[in-house]
Amino acid sequence: MNERAEEEELRRKLRLIRLLHQTNPYPQGPGTASQRRNRRRRWKQRWRQLVALADKIYTFPDPPADSPLEQTIQHLQGLTIQELPDPPTNLPESSESIDSSQRLAEI
């Protein structure tokens, strides 16, 4: 199963690289010599960029299967929301509100 997954990942990368190469066809068409030369020069520059990008795609390492992020996601997916009890209707006055009112009186 692991070899099959690796093979499928390699095929996906190769399809992406092939798509990149198909988006940059060799320039065709009429024009003066300088226009044709400039089109070829721009095409060659784009081609070098595509080759560099394809190399990065091909050599980019795959993330490990049990990365901390995936473990965290699996843990979060296991969480459920439980029904909480109704809050109490009469709350005692908190000590923080007493402290803040005493401080205001001192100022």
Swiss-Prot record:
It holds the Pfam family REV. It is found in: Host nucleus, Host nucleolus; Host cytoplasm. InterPro entries: REV_protein. Residues 21-34, 91-107 have a biased composition (Polar residues). Keywords: AIDS, Host cytoplasm, Host nucleus, mRNA transport, RNA-binding, Transport. The keyword Transcription does not apply. GO terms for cellular component: host cell cytoplasm; host cell nucleolus. Transmembrane segments: none annotated. One of its GO terms (molecular function) is RNA binding. One of its GO terms (biological process) is mRNA transport. A motif (Nuclear export signal and binding to XPO1) lies at residues 71-82. Residues 16-24 are annotated as: Homomultimerization. A motif (Nuclear localization signal and RNA-binding (RRE)) lies at residues 35-49. The keyword Transport applies. Residues 20-40, 82-107 are annotated as: Disordered. The RNA-binding motif binds to the RRE, a stem-and-loop structure present in incompletely spliced viral pre-mRNAs. This region also contains the NLS which mediates nuclear localization. These overlapping functions prevent Rev bound to RRE from undesirable return to the nucleus. When Rev binds the RRE, the NLS becomes masked while the NES remains accessible. Escorts unspliced or incompletely spliced viral pre-mRNAs (late transcripts) out of the nucleus of infected cells. These pre-mRNAs carry a recognition sequence called Rev responsive element (RRE) located in the env gene, that is not present in fully spliced viral mRNAs (early transcripts). This function is essential since most viral proteins are translated from unspliced or partially spliced pre-mRNAs which cannot exit the nucleus by the pathway used by fully processed cellular mRNAs. Homomultimer; when bound to the RRE. Multimeric assembly is essential for activity. This is Protein Rev. It comes from Human immunodeficiency virus type 2 subtype A (isolate ST) (HIV-2). The gene is rev.
